[in-house]
Amino acid sequence: MYSNLQKTDKAVFDAVEKELGRQRTKLELIASENFTSLSVMEAQGSILTNKYAEGYPGKRYYGGCEFVDMVETLAIERAKQIFGAEHANVQPHSGAQANMAAYLALINPGDTVLGLNLSHGGHLTHGHPMNFSGKYFKIVPMNVRKEDEQIDYEEAAKLALEHKPKVIMAGASNYSRIFDWKKLREIADSVDAYLICDVAHYAGLIAAGVYSNPVPYADIVTTTTHKTLRGPRGGLILCKEKHAKAVNSSVFPGQQGGPLMHVIAAKAVCFGEALKPEFKEYQTQVVKNAKELSTQLQKLGYRIVSGGTDCHVLCVDLTSKSMTGKAAEEALDKAGITTNKNTIPYDTQKPFITSGVRLGTPAVTTRGMKEAEMAAIASFIDNVLNNADNEAKLAEISKEVTAFLGKFLLYTELN
């Protein structure tokens, strides 16, 4: 796949080869990461990267777009079929740009948005002051309850009545329970607000029917196309037909110029894969693995935020272990286990330190792991965190992890 690159730019080739080695030999537990198929990568690396195609299928500002029109139309129709949506825009370059386009399709700068608090599981684009969302809009944060760390819909309803938001932004980057989209629709309707649902983390699960679908309730649904969807890095917007024109205009020319046709082709491939029966089997296993990993860690004495998980992600509270998320991430990385530090609800630590570490099962499930392997992974994690300051022990565990992964081969076609 990389023979020409090897000949023409050895520096870049070497970096790619080293990253391939890292992906093969490290235990990938970052909840937002996954391993795409070679078909997705081939589409993304195709000659479609050469084509400019400003506009939309049948309405381009450039000639010679008849074949990229075919590709984009395929992606659109497959996305609509997967999620049961009336309209799909496959052009956003990222989830963040999809969110910006969604906001500006419905509201104006200065309007009020009700979104989930970042430290309670939300996302930067749901109102963080350093993000465009926090700079352009007046943000009212939703929270989770202290007692069970699940979304406080009663408080959200009161906040909506008090602040009269124009948009309720529902979604998360670190929330392990199932959103009540119907309840959020009712809250939005009570104050005549729009409902945007960001399902970047849950899209693959939704596509397979193992997580609730917000499309029937939301005005607009946004997502990334990687993570659980296991496609290329990019964004996707789904909406009611009545919002289609505003959404399309907000993406182009509002936020972007020419679409990345090679990425859209890869999205089409990804959506095609999501329509196959084996994709549902995969997503079902992702959830089973996350639940089992949560159970095994709890048996070892770890507290899981909200008491467990209903999806692909879980967050471990390390407070009782007198360890920060930053320290845990660093120790795990030395042992060949890739994770990310994460705040927990009502965290007393700074965002770059944190009291938690976030774990996810999409990537390990892609490698073929099932419940039995989750017990081994929990044991690895426990061994690392109990020996975080022992460099020799961490090196020993790293070798054990590499040997463990030898049974779950990755990208053998690239040898």
Swiss-Prot record:
It is an enzyme of class 2 (transferase). Its EC number is 2.1.2.1. Keywords: Amino-acid biosynthesis, Cytoplasm, One-carbon metabolism, Pyridoxal phosphate, Transferase. It catalyses: (6R)-5,10-methylene-5,6,7,8-tetrahydrofolate + glycine + H2O = (6S)-5,6,7,8-tetrahydrofolate + L-serine. One of its GO terms (biological process) is tetrahydrofolate interconversion. The keyword Amino-acid biosynthesis applies. It comes from the Bacteria. PROSITE patterns: SHMT. InterPro entries: PyrdxlP-dep_Trfase, PyrdxlP-dep_Trfase_major, PyrdxlP-dep_Trfase_small, Ser_HO-MeTrfase, Ser_HO-MeTrfase-like, Ser_HO-MeTrfase_PLP_BS, SHMT-like_dom. GO terms for molecular function: glycine hydroxymethyltransferase activity; pyridoxal phosphate binding. The record marks 226 as: Plays an important role in substrate specificity. Its cofactor is pyridoxal 5'-phosphate. One of its GO terms (cellular component) is cytosol. NCBIfam families: PRK00011.1 (NF000586). PANTHER family: SERINE HYDROXYMETHYLTRANSFERASE (PTHR11680), SERINE HYDROXYMETHYLTRANSFERASE 1 (PTHR11680:SF35). Belongs to the SHMT family. This is Serine hydroxymethyltransferase. The gene is glyA.
